């Protein structure tokens, strides 16, 4: 396969900027990863959150039809912020999540919880279908079948359990808000861009709005599949490539997805390394798992078939090269696309303003 970028050993040149800050400082002081508390969900009302009611929001169906088409009338999603809650309340939740992340940096072979939390936010949002405004992050439905048992969600109970204590501590926050906020914290605390986030998701505790399985990305597919799947959510090719840059964080596990390994050396730092690594030389890995690719130079990194599709299709490749050359541009595009992903289908009040959370490092410097 042709090489379009420097070899992996050279990816730390000026196109990639690492921001270690609190991550490195905290890691040096970590003696071991803390135990993960185990919680159990039920199919009724896990927490009687003030924000977890199932209001019909009378009169909103016509607005939804105007926004999303006639078929969206049954899938009205009006943001409703718990009474008396403001940006400062959500910043406290962010701080608690970020602190817990920083206390568990050795988790998963030093990958930490960044990839887990980003994947949870991504997958709870990635079921959205713009044709009828169904799915997405609004209802926090991943605790219900069949979504909970979607093969593409295997392993995400770890991320949900990581965040569970904050549903207890902050009973007014919805699952949808907490899970997406966790993804924002993962990106920002690992050195990534600021993500605009808005509260107001309302939990579905009746399991009446659970999306069908099959909407999340199947990593074994080709470029056309990737293009069509992201188009279903309302994304163009550029946004698609930007969103898949999330693979820079974390790693795959054979016992969950059938794939194994990190995508590159930056698995606990949000950078553009996914793209520079992807543009190297690869071969199909010889092993007993699903088809995946292994880098020629080190044999330590992996790519999924859907990742490789980004360099095989010209309508994706130009953006891969663009982001490999310009991390600042990638950050800008990712921030915009990810904010769109986690908010898809939700109608916010006209006076609703996005929240930009301060990182722990920024607060330390104040």
Swiss-Prot record:
<dbReference type="GO" id="GO:0034599">
    <property type="term" value="P:cellular response to oxidative stress"/>
</dbReference>
<keyword id="KW-0809">Transit peptide</keyword>
<comment type="similarity">
    <text>Belongs to the peroxidase family. Cytochrome c peroxidase subfamily.</text>
</comment>
<dbReference type="GO" id="GO:0000302">
    <property type="term" value="P:response to reactive oxygen species"/>
</dbReference>
<dbReference type="GO" id="GO:0005758">
    <property type="term" value="C:mitochondrial intermembrane space"/>
</dbReference>
<dbReference type="GO" id="GO:0046872">
    <property type="term" value="F:metal ion binding"/>
</dbReference>
<dbReference type="GO" id="GO:0004601">
    <property type="term" value="F:peroxidase activity"/>
</dbReference>
<keyword id="KW-0349">Heme</keyword>
<feature type="binding site" description="axial binding residue">
    <location>
        <position position="247"/>
    </location>
    <ligand>
        <name>heme b</name>
    </ligand>
</feature>
<keyword id="KW-0479">Metal-binding</keyword>
<comment type="function">
    <text>Destroys radicals which are normally produced within the cells and which are toxic to biological systems.</text>
</comment>
<feature type="site" description="Transition state stabilizer">
    <location>
        <position position="119"/>
    </location>
</feature>
<keyword id="KW-0575">Peroxidase</keyword>
<dbReference type="GO" id="GO:0042744">
    <property type="term" value="P:hydrogen peroxide catabolic process"/>
</dbReference>
<keyword id="KW-0560">Oxidoreductase</keyword>
<dbReference type="GO" id="GO:0005759">
    <property type="term" value="C:mitochondrial matrix"/>
</dbReference>
<feature type="compositionally biased region" description="Basic and acidic residues">
    <location>
        <begin position="195"/>
        <end position="206"/>
    </location>
</feature>
<dbReference type="GO" id="GO:0004130">
    <property type="term" value="F:cytochrome-c peroxidase activity"/>
</dbReference>
<dbReference type="InterPro" id="IPR002016">
    <property type="entry name" value="Haem_peroxidase"/>
</dbReference>
<keyword id="KW-0408">Iron</keyword>
<dbReference type="GO" id="GO:0020037">
    <property type="term" value="F:heme binding"/>
</dbReference>
<dbReference type="InterPro" id="IPR002207">
    <property type="entry name" value="Peroxidase_I"/>
</dbReference>
<comment type="subunit">
    <text>Forms a one-to-one complex with cytochrome c.</text>
</comment>
<feature type="active site" description="Tryptophan radical intermediate">
    <location>
        <position position="263"/>
    </location>
</feature>
<feature type="active site" description="Proton acceptor">
    <location>
        <position position="123"/>
    </location>
</feature>
<dbReference type="InterPro" id="IPR010255">
    <property type="entry name" value="Haem_peroxidase_sf"/>
</dbReference>
<dbReference type="GO" id="GO:0034614">
    <property type="term" value="P:cellular response to reactive oxygen species"/>
</dbReference>
<dbReference type="InterPro" id="IPR044831">
    <property type="entry name" value="Ccp1-like"/>
</dbReference>
<feature type="region of interest" description="Disordered">
    <location>
        <begin position="195"/>
        <end position="218"/>
    </location>
</feature>
<keyword id="KW-0496">Mitochondrion</keyword>
<dbReference type="Pfam" id="PF00141">
    <property type="entry name" value="peroxidase"/>
</dbReference>
<protein>
    <recommendedName>
        <fullName>Cytochrome c peroxidase, mitochondrial</fullName>
        <ecNumber>1.11.1.5</ecNumber>
    </recommendedName>
</protein>
């Amino acid at each position: 396969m042709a090489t379009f970028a420097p070899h992996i050993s050279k990816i730390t040149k000026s196109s990639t900027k690492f921001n270690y800050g609190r991550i490195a400082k905290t890691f040096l002081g970590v003696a071991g990863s803390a135990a993960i508390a185990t919680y159990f969900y039920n199919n009724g009302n896990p927490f009687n959150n003030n924000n977890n009611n199932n209001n019909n929001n009378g009169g909103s169906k016509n607005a939804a039809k105007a926004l999303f088409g006639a078929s969206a009338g049954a899938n009205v999603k009006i943001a409703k912020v718990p009474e008396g809650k403001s940006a400062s309340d959500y910043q406290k939740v962010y701080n608690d999540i970020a602190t817990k992340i920083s206390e568990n940096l050795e988790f998963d072979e030093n990958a930490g919880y960044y990839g887990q939390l980003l994947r949870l936010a991504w997958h709870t949002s990635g079921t959205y279908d713009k044709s009828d405004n169904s799915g997405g992050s609004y209802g926090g439905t991943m605790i219900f079948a069949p979504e909970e048992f979607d093969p593409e969600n295997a392993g995400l109970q770890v991320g949900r359990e990581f965040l569970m204590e904050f549903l207890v501590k902050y009973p007014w926050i919805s699952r949808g808000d907490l899970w997406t906020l966790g993804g924002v914290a993962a990106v920002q605390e690992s050195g990534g861009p600021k993500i605009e986030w808005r509260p107001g998701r309302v939990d579905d505790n009746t399991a009446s709005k659970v999306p069908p399985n099959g909407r999340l990305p199947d990593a074994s597919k080709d470029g056309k599949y990737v293009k069509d799947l992201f188009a279903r959510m309302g994304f163009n090719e550029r946004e698609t490539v930007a969103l898949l840059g999330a693979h820079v964080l974390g790693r795959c596990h054979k016992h969950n997805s059938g794939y194994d390994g990190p995508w590159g050396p930056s698995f606990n730092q949000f950078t553009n390394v996914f793209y520079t690594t992807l543009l190297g030389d690869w071969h199909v890995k010889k092993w007993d798992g699903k088809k995946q690719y292994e880098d020629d130079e080190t044999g330590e990194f992996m790519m999924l078939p859907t990742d490789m599709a980004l360099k095989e299709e010209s309508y994706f490749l130009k953006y891969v090269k663009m982001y490999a050359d310009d991390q600042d541009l990638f950050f800008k595009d990712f921030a915009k696309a990810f904010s769109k992903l986690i908010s898809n289908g939700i109608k916010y009040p006209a006076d609703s303003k996005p929240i930009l959370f301060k990182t722990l490092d920024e607060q330390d410097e104040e």
